Regions:
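Actinobacteria-biased recognition of intrinsically disordered, low-complexity terminal regions
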Residues: 1-20, 223-260
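Hydrophobic, aromatic-enriched alpha-helical segments typical of multi-pass transmembrane helices
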Residues: 6-224
Length: 260
């Protein structure tokens, strides 16, 4: 079965849509920054970001809506990533991981925490034990956050490895972001087990994910897929036919416009 790629103009348009979606998602993904005005006590770093969406919290609808909006935008971004990367190494896997970040954000916006550790002492105590952390894995809201974290960390590293061929600068940037996201996630677990607040590291990880999404948006706007299309002057010329066959079978590459 032969799979026909969309025309170059259509792929470019899809890439641009993915780029602008990524930039939009970068803003909405870090909507917790608005808590400085909606819930000042939660902006100090001690509370979980998800507590902003808990029932009864002021403007909880705003933060849940922002999670849903960013999730949808990230899923669209995944399509743009796939279209631009095409047949590059890890292209499909990177696109799936980006989409998983979006799905995780969607689930975050449609589910809530079972309790608020910043105001519930029993809930806070459960957060600081290994058994309590394992019990949280039975909650969809916790699972979605874990999926989003792992997908962002692994996706950023794999995207960086993919980009090293066409742009070492972009590749190193993506890898650095991915490793830092992973480090903050591991630090969160250590802090939870130690009974310390993780609000600061959780917010840092969220900002890093937003930075990654913004980087993807800029990358998609600057990237230009190269399509190899050769049409022989003489359809009956064996040499010309061979040239066309080789050109059509070549793996598409991607170039990135570097700023000076």
């Amino acid at each position: 079965m032969t799979i026909t790629r969309p025309p170059r103009q259509q792929r470019r348009a899809l890439g641009d849509i993915g780029a602008y979606s990524a930039l939009f998602a970068a803003l909405t993904y870090s909507s917790f920054l608005l808590s400085r005005w909606t819930r000042p006590a939660a902006s100090r770093g001690a509370a979980f970001i998800s507590e902003l969406e808990a029932p009864g919290q002021p403007y909880n609808w705003l933060f849940r809506l922002s999670d849903i909006a960013s999730g949808l935008a990230i899923v669209v971004t995944a399509l743009g990533v796939f279209v631009i990367l095409e047949q590059q190494r890890w292209a499909k896997l990177v696109s799936v991981l980006v989409a998983c970040v979006g799905v995780g954000s969607l689930i975050d916006g449609t589910t809530t925490m079972s309790c608020s550790p910043s105001v519930d002492q029993r809930c806070a105590a459960a957060e600081s034990t290994a058994s309590g952390l394992l019990q949280q894995l039975n909650q969809l809201h916790t699972d979605s956050g874990l999926i989003g974290f792992l997908s962002a960390a692994i996706g950023a590293v794999l995207l960086g490895m993919t980009l090293m061929v066409s742009s070492a600068r972009w590749g190193r940037l993506m890898i650095a972001i991915g490793l830092t996201i992973a480090a903050t996630g591991l630090l969160d677990i250590c802090l939870l087990l130690a009974g310390a607040d993780i609000g600061t590291t959780e917010r840092l990880r969220t900002l890093l994910t937003s930075a990654w999404l913004a980087s993807i948006g800029i990358l998609l706007l600057r990237a230009r897929p190269i399509l190899t299309s050769a049409k022989p002057a003489n359809q009956h010329d064996p040499a010309a036919k061979a040239t066309m066959t080789v050109a059509q079978s070549a793996r598409p590459q991607m170039t990135i416009e570097e700023s000076t």
